[in-house]
């Protein structure tokens, strides 16, 4: 990946973080967990080689790549990315995010253009991703399935069941990406998950890659791995990345941005 491409992708991440800050200032939401996964989404949707092609996703083409956001509370990051790619107008997020019965809710919903699966009940997206990958394999359909999972979400038993299922069925067309931002909804993850997940995943037989979750080039290289095994990418991230007063503080899991924090974001993100 050449430097001009890296700079272009970094500008996309900046715009997405600005969008997250603005909508969280207006309407609240899951700000810190959205900020932590922006580079992951940018690598998935915008880096080369191109994956998750919009025209195939809109048409539900059988050969499309599929993305499932199992950590459905990262909705603001995904909405901001889909706006970047013109799936729906920016005004939807400006005017309707978390407002009544409008489709841009506090967890991703399949009625939103570009969203494959409704999520929010943690751990469920992993199983859906396994089913879709298995179907592609059985039907000999091309295309990858990508599933973004929170590190706190890994306390759900269904995540581990999905991992074992993917390994047993040799789902080499499936990649789990763990947003390892180290903070769950209430506390630091290390306070309730006491073992090293990567060792367990490797012990089960998965191909595990650990990357800097804020380095788009590293994430993209991991996504391009040609392993013949089911792959798990563990992305080392910072919850609240990009806004210093939000970073690494459990209180910001879901919270309306106040004036002082908004001004900090304006200064640090440059808007």
Label for each model-derived stretch:
Residues 22, 33-168, 193:
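Cofactor-binding active-site loop characterized by glycine-rich and histidine/acidic residues
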Residues 65-67, 143-147, 174, 228-237:
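Generic beta-sheet signal
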Residues 73-74, 78, 181-182, 215, ...:
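Glycine-rich beta-alpha junction loops
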């Amino acid at each position: 990946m050449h430097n001009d491409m890296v700079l272009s992708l970094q500008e996309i991440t900046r715009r997405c973080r600005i969008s997250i800050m603005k909508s969280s200032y207006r309407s609240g939401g899951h700000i810190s967990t959205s900020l932590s996964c922006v580079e992951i989404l940018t690598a998935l949707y915008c880096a080369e080689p191109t994956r998750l092609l919009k025209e195939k996703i809109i048409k539900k083409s059988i050969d499309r790549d599929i993305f499932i956001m199992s950590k459905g509370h990262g909705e603001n990051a995904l909405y901001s990315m889909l706006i970047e790619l013109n799936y729906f107008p920016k005004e939807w997020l400006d005017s309707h995010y978390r407002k009544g019965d409008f489709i841009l809710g506090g967890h991703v919903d399949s009625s939103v253009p570009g969203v494959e699966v409704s999520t929010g009940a943690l751990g469920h997206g992993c199983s859906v991703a396994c089913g879709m990958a298995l179907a592609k394999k059985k039907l000999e359909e091309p295309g990858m399935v990508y599933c973004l999972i929170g590190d706190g979400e890994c306390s759900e038993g269904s995540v581990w069941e999905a991992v074992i299922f993917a390994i047993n069925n040799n789902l080499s067309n499936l990649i789990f990406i763990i947003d390892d931002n180290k903070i769950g909804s209430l506390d630091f993850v290390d306070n309730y998950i006491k073992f090293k997940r990567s060792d367990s995943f490797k012990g089960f037989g998965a191909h595990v890659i650990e990357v800097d979750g804020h380095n788009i080039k590293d994430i993209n290289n991991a996504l391009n791995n040609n392993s013949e095994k089911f792959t798990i990418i563990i992305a080392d991230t910072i919850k609240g990345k990009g806004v210093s007063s939000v970073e690494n503080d459990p209180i910001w899991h879901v919270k309306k941005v106040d004036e002082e924090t908004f001004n900090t974001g304006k200064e640090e993100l440059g808007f």
